[in-house]
Every structure is written in structure tokens, then in C-alpha cells.
Amino acid sequence: MAEKGFNSVMQGYFALVLHAHLPFVRHPEHENFLEESWLFEAVTETYVPLLQMLERWRRDNMTVPITISLSPPLCAMLRDPLLCGRYERHLNSLIDLAEKEIRRTHWDRAFRELAWMYHHRFTGIREFWQNCGGNLVNAFKQLQNEGRIEIITTAATHALLPLLASHPSSIRAQILTARDDYRSCFGRDPRGIWLPECAYVSGVEKYLQEANIRWFILDTHGILYAEPRPRYGTFAPVFTPNGIAAFGRDFDSSRQVWSQREGYPGDPRYRDFYRDVGFDLDFDYVKPHLPSPETRGFTGIKYYRITGQGEKQIYQRDAALKAADEHAQHFLNERIGQIQRLTGLLDRPPLAVAPYDAELFGHWWHEGVEFLDLFARKLFYDQKVIELITPGEYLRRHPTNQVATPSSSTWGEEGYMRVWLNDKNEWIYPHLQIAQERMSALAEKYKKVTSTGKKASWSTALKTRALRQAARELLLAQSSDWPFILRAGTSPDYARRRVKDHLLRFIGLHDQLTSTSIDEAWLQAVEAQDNIFPAADWSYWR
């Protein structure tokens, strides 16, 4: 590939946006906790591989800016000493298991080579982790400071904002708390936001403006059904009436990656997600390496490819990488054709925005990071039609856009709210409504409990701690992850327990704040359990 870079002859833009989010799961009361493995798997399979890819682009002097949304709960977990220590233990256990597998598969060359592949991958991840001091947030921050990526935020606990619209101060608290957390992580204000589940309701812009956020992303129909209808469809953003830019998801680039029937990840040459040695091998053999010693689970070592509906065949790494290369070329060709068909129809170069969950790449789709790497390299070196751009840079170049009010929408099934509001999770919302009203009442009651420049009394300091913890518990209860899990049925008991635990803790704090005393020992225990947002501002509910 001949060396090239982006230049003025480009006919259009492509914006790649990856959304990295996991619910806040941290259980210091247990030595091992199954749901903490959600983070450990994503670090090993997605977040570190993405950082390794970005480091290779830096090494090769590739200017391929992408946008990454890092949610506040994810950043909190990635910065938490307890979870970081547990991740190191988990990673060392994976390396030990890979070494055992090398010995076990000694007489079978095909399986032995795969065992060595995993050993090499895991040791490389450990080396990267150690080289960055176990601080992945700082590694992303450095790339942003160098201008190689743009990091955006999302709502504080990934709450579905339209379902909080009856109590707007909760929307405000979700957005401003996220802004504050971003400042603590990255030393600046976020310019863009990933609205959780791309869920939009008119009025959210007021709080985005207060947080100095300039743009957000919607699903395709959120833009296409805007009023008035957008002249350029999703191929240019619109400004909401208060000047916040809304970018629409490009349907074609989404379909080619996400679609169960047409999407690339379903190719039979790719690694099968579900066939894991944690389920296939003798339980006593894999037990020391499982997320929970009481039950089988994923280890990350998987020897089979998707194959088809019948018996699975052994994974062939070279064939999978060939598929990734073919798909990267096809994806690029499709984007080039798309841009060329649109050239001249707009008053500026057309833009295709492709937002994806980051965890699709590497975790769910094992070869997904290689696909991104190959696509970026082909785009950078082999064509002169498309320029990779961030939405923030697009707005700098094209500051004038049509004004329109987007349609209420999400990127969930059927495009609206039913994934998060249905007969499996509707019980949550009346309780949230009451808690939100009580939080606002507390904020109003204690509005004079603020710093006056004098040393606060012990009683005032204790009340401030209780108010902050009440804010944390309400924010955690509002997470969209819990109703999503309840609807999907993947870990419903855990999701149900989390909602109830946070609401009960909130009720306890509310009752103490409206009575004559606060149980400091209990408060301290709750603070240690749910330690997200150390500087949570309860006054946002006023």
C-alpha cells in the first residue's frame, strides 16, 4: 500500500463512533463475583485490543481519527484499585489456563496452535496493561490529547433519558454528573455525548447546553422524521432550535455490521462466541479459572468457528483473518460507492456516521478489532474518496446546518422505548418516580447546606455525605442496564436485586435525612459499597 494521507480531494466523510459502556458492578463484600467478569472480559477482548490498535496507528503515523464514548461507570471501574487488582488476578489465571491447554493439547497440532495463540494474546495484553500502569483511562486520555481520537461521554449511569422526562431534574443530574465525571477523567469538558441507547426526547437539549455539550447521535429515524424534514437526510447533521447538533446513524453501514442475516460477524469462518472451554472441558479442570467457582462460565478460550447450524468445526485463524480482510474491503467499497452516489447532491461533502457498541469488536465479534484495523488502513492508504472525521471536527468545518427538531426515538428494537418499558420491567418506574420526587425535596430542603468558606460542622458534613450518597443511589437505580437485562432475561435476578438494593438504600438515606439522626456507620458502609462519583452534586435535583 503506497503511503498517503487525507487531503483536499476527498469527496465525503465517514465518522466511526464506538460506544464503550458497562453497568457499574463492584462487590467488595465478595472475593469472587460472577458479574464482575463482564468488565474483565471486555478489558481483555475489546478495550486493550482497541488501545493496541490505536497505538499501532500512532506508530505508523496514520491520521485516522475516531470517536470513542467512555461511559462514567466504565471509567469508574477502570480506575478502581479493587477491580484493577481483581482484573490482574483474572488475567494471570487466563495465562495459567492457556499454559495448561498447551500441555493438554500437546498431541493435537491444530488445538495446540490455538492454545499458543491465546497464550500469546493474553501475555501481550498483560504486557500492555503493565506498561500503562493498569490505567486504561489515562491511555485513552493521552490519545485524545495527541488529537488521535475524540472522547465523548454519556449519561451518568446510562439512564434512558426519555423515561425520566416527567422529572426533568433527573435528566439534568444525569447529564451534569456525566460532565463533572468527564472533567475528572480527562481534564476538559466533553464536546459530544452518546445519548444512552440513542434515546432522544425533545427538551434534553436544554441540559446539554448547560453542560456545554455541542452534539449528539440519534438513530436514523430520529433524524429522518425531524420537523421540518432534513434536506440531506442523515448525510448532514441538523441543529436543534437551541443550536445543539444532532447526527443521524447511517442505515447502510449499520446494516452491514449489525444485521443478524446480512452482517459480517455471522460469517462461518469467524470464531464462535459460545463454544468455550469453560463449558466444554471437565469442570474440575476449568474450575480454578472460571468467573465463579460454583458454576460454569466463559473463560475466553474458544476453539471452534461459527460453521453453521450443525456440528462446529475447529477455528482456523488464517481463514478468519482472510474473512476480516475481505469484509473490510467490501465495507470500504460500499462506503466509497455511497459517497460517490451522493456527491454533488449536497452543498457540502456528504457524511456517513457509523455508531456501534465498542464491545461488538473483539468481544462478541472476535475478529472485529482486526476488521477495524484493516478497514482504517485501506481507507488511509488505498483510496482518495473518503476522509475519516469526528463529528466535532465536522462541525468546525461546517458550522452552518439546517435547524430542525428531531423525533423521539431510540436505536432499540422497533425504534422506540419498549425494550426498556414492558411487562418485565415496568414495575421499576413508579418507584423511580417517587425516589426522584423525594430527591428533589431533599435538595430543596438542604439548599442552604453549602460551603460558606468556614469549616463545616460535623452535623453539616454528615448530612452532605448522606445527600451525596442518596444522589449516587438514585443515579445507579436509574441505569438503563437493569430494565434491559430484565427484558433480555440474561441475568434477571441480579438486575432485579440491583434496582431494589439502590432504591432501598436511597429510602434509608432519605428517611435519615428527614429525621433527627444519621447512622454514620451504616452510611460509611454504603459509601464503601457504591463509591462511584466521589463528588456527586445533590443540588442538581433542585
Where do the protein language model's features map onto the residues?
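Acidic (Asp/Glu)-rich catalytic clusters
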Residues: 9-10, 55-63, 135-152, 183-186, ...
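Active-site and substrate-binding clefts of carbohydrate-active enzymes
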Residues: 9-63, 70-112, 228-542
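Short, solvent-exposed turn/loop segments enriched in Gly/Ser/Thr/Pro and often Arg
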Residues: 69-74, 155, 192-201, 221, ...
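Glycine-rich phosphate-binding "P-loop"
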Residues: 155-177
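His/Asp/Glu-enriched short active-site or ligand-binding loop at hydrolase and phosphoryl-transfer sites
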Residues: 160, 213-226, 389-390
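CE4/NodB-like, metal-dependent polysaccharide N-deacetylase domain
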Residues: 170-195, 334-355
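Conserved short loop/turn motifs at secondary-structure junctions
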Residues: 189-200, 357-361, 491
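Hydrophobic, small-residue-rich alpha-helical packing segments that form membrane-like cores
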Residues: 199, 204-213, 229
